[in-house]
Curated annotation (Swiss-Prot):
Region (Interaction with STAMBP): 196-223, 204-208, 222-223
Stretches the record annotates as Intramolecular interaction with N-terminus: 151-221
Function: Probable core component of the endosomal sorting required for transport complex III (ESCRT-III) which is involved in multivesicular bodies (MVBs) formation and sorting of endosomal cargo proteins into MVBs. MVBs contain intraluminal vesicles (ILVs) that are generated by invagination and scission from the limiting membrane of the endosome and mostly are delivered to lysosomes enabling degradation of membrane proteins, such as stimulated growth factor receptors, lysosomal enzymes and lipids. The MVB pathway appears to require the sequential function of ESCRT-O, -I,-II and -III complexes.
Membrane topology: Lipid-anchor
Covalent cross-link Glycyl lysine isopeptide (Lys-Gly) (interchain with G-Cter in ubiquitin) as placed by the record, residue numbers: K179
Gene Ontology biological-process annotations: autophagosome maturation; autophagy; endosome to lysosome transport; endosome transport via multivesicular body sorting pathway; late endosome to lysosome transport; late endosome to vacuole transport; midbody abscission; mitotic metaphase chromosome alignment
Lineage: Eukaryota, Metazoa, Chordata, Craniata, Vertebrata
GO cellular component: amphisome membrane; autophagosome membrane; cytoplasmic vesicle; cytosol; early endosome; ESCRT III complex; kinetochore; kinetochore microtubule
Subunit structure: Probable core component of the endosomal sorting required for transport complex III (ESCRT-III). ESCRT-III components are thought to multimerize to form a flat lattice on the perimeter membrane of the endosome. Several assembly forms of ESCRT-III may exist that interact and act sequentially. Forms a metastable monomer in solution; its core structure (without part of the putative autoinhibitory C-terminal acidic region) oligomerizes into a flat lattice via two different dimerization interfaces.
Protein name per its UniProtKB record: Charged multivesicular body protein 3
Keywords (A to Z) from UniProt: Cell cycle, Cell division, Coiled coil, Cytoplasm, Endosome, Isopeptide bond, Lipoprotein, Membrane, Myristate, Phosphoprotein, Protein transport, Transport, Ubl conjugation
Length: 223
């Protein structure tokens, strides 16, 4: 559909500038989410070290899986920033074309970037809105419905490879959990003597509550 196929409330240049502002705003949101997840990851690292000292192998594995999920989430957020940069570059090109041709043009680069961005849950709503506006303006073509579906790889992350879990544990404990790339079935370091390991049943319950709270915080940050 061409730019002037339907009545436009705003001129093309204003539309492009508005889209660029929205993209930059979402990039700041993504940056903030990355920082929040990474801060929480540092807390998880400390918890892994504490659990290793107490000989809590299962807790270590659970926390390592949380770190894997968090790192995958951060990687996706960084990828989304790259796509948003591509869209911003596309917007600059549109302004250049607008000055010469007097109208906006279709852009396969912007189309590809937007197809990826509408799959990112953290920014999905804004990207859908922008996509619809860009379709009306004729910059991108209508996207298939399945491109709007949120990608849920929770199951995949639940089955994180043992090698990756072991690598995380080896990294955090500086090799205290065995030698890389050994499996997580390797014995943990001997528990600390006497007082340190004479934890009461109440302490164990507190540990479980702390673990659940940490998992909940990470899940909230990733969603």
């Amino acid at each position: 559909m061409g730019l002037f196929g339907k009545t436009q409330e705003k001129p093309p240049k204003e539309l492009v500038n508005e889209w660029s502002l929205k993209i930059r705003k979402e990039m700041r949101v993504v940056d903030r989410q990355i920082r929040d997840i990474q801060r929480e990851e540092e807390k998880v690292k400390r918890s892994v070290k504490d659990a290793a000292k107490k000989g809590q192998k299962e807790v270590c594995v659970v926390l390592a899986k949380e770190m894997i999920r968090s790192r995958k989430a951060v990687s996706k957020l960084y990828a989304s920033k790259a796509h948003m940069n591509s869209v911003l570059m596309g917007m600059k090109n549109q302004l250049a074309v607008l000055r010469v041709a007097g109208s906006l043009q279709k852009s396969t680069e912007v189309m590809k970037a937007m197809q990826s961005l509408v799959k990112i849950p953290e920014i999905q709503a804004t990207m859908r809105e922008l996509s619809k506006e860009m379709m009306k303006a004729g910059i991108i073509e209508e996207m298939l419905e399945d491109t709007f579906e949120s990608m849920d790889d929770q199951e995949e992350m639940e089955e994180a490879a043992e090698m990756e879990i072991d690598r995380i544990l080896f990294e955090i404990t500086a090799g205290a959990l065995g030698k890389a790339p050994s499996k997580v079935t390797d014995a943990l370091p001997e528990p600390e003597p006497a007082g340190a390991m004479a934890a009461s049943e109440g302490d164990e319950e507190d540990d479980e509550e702390d673990l659940e709270a940490m998992q909940s915080r990470l899940a909230t940050l990733r969603s």
